[in-house]
Amino acid sequence: MQVMRTFNQPPTSSHPTPTLNDSDTCITLYNHRGYARVLMPLFYCIVFFVGLLGNALAFHIIRPNVKKINSTTLYSANLVISDILFTLSLPLRIIYYALGFHWPLGETLCKIVGLIFYINTYAGVNFMTCLSVDRFIAVVLPLRFARFRKVSNVRYICVGVWLLVLMQTLPLLSMPMTNEEPDGFITCMEYPNFEPVPNISYILIGAVFLGYGVPVVTILVCYSILCCKLRLAAKANQLTDKSGRSQKAIGVICCVSLVFVVCFSPYHIDLLQYMIRKLIYTPDCAELTAFQISLHFTVCLMNLNSCLDPFIYFFACKGYKTKVLKILKRQVSVSFSSAARTLPEGLSRDISDGNKIHLNSTRHKE
């Protein structure tokens, strides 16, 4: 009952002027809650529905190909699973933002949601990195490192990725995740809650290096060399150049790289610059407030990646695109049939005949 009362009546707060209530506590960190409690839940609702539907569709298409699985499909399947698990952690975060950065569900549940959130975010980063290395080996070094593309070895690599991410994120369970603010709001998974942790600046700089620095360099290097190789192959083979296949592949590579950089760079650069400043001097309340607001924006941008991946699959994979269009055509056909059953008999027959004529004419064109 107490939890329900807290859900229904979150604490109210005024917006004080930028100041400190004592030498250590900044009271202006959440002054933006007035518009954040509207915009952030709206944004995350879109990410949740688009991400869940898109990735569920991707998993539905990948799953029947398990018998013909290869290294790329296996990495893609793990990436899809990480995106689905990530989106499933969003509803409680949506409630948290809708209540104006108030978490009434306790420390334990906050830690569980936080752990799921970070595990699947960085699992996704690592599987995108694996995909870039896999493509690099397939095109640039197909014979020398072919063993790394064997399905039996790739399975071990996937298990290793999950274990690595788990080891990187499990320390979160030993850190404080919630904090009661002076205005009565209880925050969850916010940066200021981690400030009391000893050497937090060094920990986060190391996390940025391992979780973002190594993957982004690997992805950009692999895809840059891959693009050069494809250009050279296109120049050497006039048929390939005329068909435009190389240009399409290069376009997809650039798109994947751009999405990764745009989604993940702002958050990690923002975190890195503040931690470096924190090592040099003690930022004041105004700087901490600006950093906190920027974190909320850059985290939104980072989380957008989970619902962009299915669109990349659509344009990058011919088989995926074909199957999606088949499913959509099937749904349209079912909708026509349902509509016809609800109409008078004569009109229903006219629609059915018209639909058959359309399908037959389409088949003749093909």
Swiss-Prot record:
- List the InterPro entries hit by this protein, alphabetically: GP183-like (IPR047160), GPCR_Rhodpsn (IPR000276), GPCR_Rhodpsn_7TM (IPR017452)
Looking at the keywords, is Glycoprotein present? yes
Q: What GO cellular component term, any one, is given?
A: plasma membrane
Write out the topological domains of type Extracellular. 1-37, 102-111, 175-199, 273-292
What are the disulfide bonds?
A: 110-188
Q: Per its UniProt record, what Pfam families does this chain match?
A: 7tm_1 (PF00001)
GO molecular function list:
G protein-coupled receptor activity; oxysterol binding
**Topology of the protein relative to the lipid bilayer:** Multi-pass membrane protein
Q: TM segments? A: 38-63, 84-101, 112-133, 156-174, 200-222, 249-272, 293-317
Main location as per UniProt: membrane
Q: Which residues lie on this side of the membrane: Cytoplasmic?
A: 64-83, 134-155, 223-248, 318-366
What is one Gene Ontology biological process annotated in the Swiss-Prot or TrEMBL record?
dendritic cell homeostasis
CDD domains for the chain: 7tmA_EBI2 (cd15159)
* The entry's keywords: Adaptive immunity, Cell membrane, Disulfide bond, G-protein coupled receptor, Glycoprotein, Immunity, Membrane, Receptor, Transducer, Transmembrane, Transmembrane helix
The compartments listed are: Cell membrane
Q: Per the UniProt annotation, where are the glycans attached?
A: 21
Into which family does the record put it? Belongs to the G-protein coupled receptor 1 family.
* Protein name according to UniProt: G-protein coupled receptor 183
- This chain's source organism reads Salmo salar (Atlantic salmon)
Q: Gene name, please?
A: gpr183
